[in-house]
Amino acid sequence: MEKEVHWWDKLGKPQYGSEIVVRVERDIVNFDPYFLEGLTGIFGAWMERLVSDDWTLDPEVWDYKLAWHPSKYQKGHLAESWEFPDQTTHIIHLRKGIHWQDLPPANGREFTADDVVFHYNRLYALGGGFIKPSPSRAADIRFKDLLSVSAPDKYTVVFKFKTQNPESIMETLHNVSLAQCMENPDAVKKWGDVSDWHHAIGTGPFILKDFVAGNFATLVKNPNYWGYDERYPQNKLPYVDKLSYLIMPDENEAIAAMSGGKIDIIPQVTSAHAIAIKKTNPEILQIPTSGGPTVTLQPRNDKPPFNDLRVRKALQLAIDLPSIARFHYGGLVEPYPSTLTSKDMTGWGFPYEQWPQGLKDEYTYNPAGAKKLLADAGYPNGFKTNVVADASSDLELLQIIKSYLADIEIEMEVQLMKTPDWVSFVEIGRKHEQLVYRQYGPLGHTKAPLRIITQFYTGYAANYQMVSDPVFDAFYPRAVAATNEDQLKQVIKEANEHVARQHYVISLLQPRAYALCQPWLKGGYNAQVHSIWMGSGGPSMLSFYGARFWIDHDLKKSMGH
């Protein structure tokens, strides 16, 4: 009998042992999925999801480069299977024999449907004595229709929605999000929450062993992990003995460590750094990521002066995007404004090339036109303003923007904050008065369509611009009601155009970023290397991909490491 050939055979036979070391750009401030602000949690390394990616899927079919994974390419993880008895009911059947890590107070007990109910009740205050939803989920329109979560038996979970449909339910519950990582109820009941890293307990392949803020996090293999490799069903996971994170805000320092073989993965670097390291270390693999950090200047749309569309247009006209593309990015980025949906989501947006000339003119450098708009809005002599900036963002670019605004007599004071402080001040506290600036803005998304359509929804957690526009709010129910992909694409395209015309944010550029990995890191194809930590999967996929990647020991040794 002829041996069956699989596409992954070319990746080599998996090997056990060794360690994967990952560079983390910002400090880790969160160990509890209830507190999602800032996406600086890594709890996806030991907590798991109900549904995950299809590890056996041929990359020629779907390459996981986008943050959005269509439901047809998802498979059960903690869940074994699911069904939809009607349009608004989703029934999950859990795998049997999954156990929590053997740590107190869980002590290795079995994972059951009651644990899933606890997670969703806690996150969305649906019952079980929880009256306050997660700060980040409270305003998430996608879950407004979630009526209840129940467990009719030990391995069955029933979700009841009000007006959604099977496709939107799959996207809402199971698409990539930190909110889907299951925390241990016993730990929450004992300590109130699991924010302290010492209380980290999951069902995943790695156990958090050590953490020093601003320095590192170390995870070790869970000896009692339930999972096996879907490609090699006889292989128990994980392959590596240790998963380590080195917290390195400075990209130059991270590049140096990568060049010296001390880091296996850098999730994201700029084009300039990718070009530089290709010259010094051509053996290091470079994976173009979907889009890149969508830097934007984000005004509060609910307060003067930025509640006036003319003022927001003026700021856009004051900025010379082609010059920034040429001189700041060295010509390594397209000189066009970012749009709500990244160009990488082909067919899902409203790319600049399709804009009518009148709209293009609103994004074309024109300081004289900007001054006229300011005068028409009642600011003939400009005004003073301030911006709360995340210190981990591109501060050189911020100074360039400040200079452009000064040319139209807008004096912008910069208030720098470290990422945790920025999150507390802006994302949680909403204490910013006028402008905010951060590396990862609300444009250029490759996320799920229903996630994109909520970006500027009234009251949504990530709506730092405080936009409240009934026209934009109306896109969400239309998206949920879409009965086919073409209808949904049309809604997303219209939303893109509306955002561009309303100038909710000052659009800048979307540089191409790259993930870097050492050649001895094996198991996945290129896009999946990026998938582990950023882009298509992010922190919630750490346990999934981290368990399935392995180190080619002979290759690493032959390269002197």
Sequence positions of predicted segments:
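N-terminal lobe/hinge region of extracytoplasmic solute-binding protein
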Residues: E2-W8, I20-D86, I201
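Short, well-ordered beta-strand elements
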Residues: G17-D27, E80, T89-H93, V116-H119, ...
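Alpha-helical secondary-structure segments
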Residues: V21, G108, A113-F118, K154-V158, ...
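Detector for C-terminal structural segments
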Residues: V24, G38-A45, V212-A217, K221, ...
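Gly/Pro-rich hinge or "lid" segments in bacterial periplasmic/extracellular proteins
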Residues: S52-Y73, P133, K154, T172-S244, ...
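Aromatic- and charge-enriched surface segment that lines or borders ligand/interaction sites
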Residues: L78-G129, V158, A254-A257, P305-N307
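Surface-exposed binding/hinge segments that line
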Residues: E83-P85, I91-K96, D115, A125-A187, ...
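Extracellular/periplasmic solute-recognition and catalytic clefts
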Residues: G129-P135, V149, K209-V220, S244-K303, ...
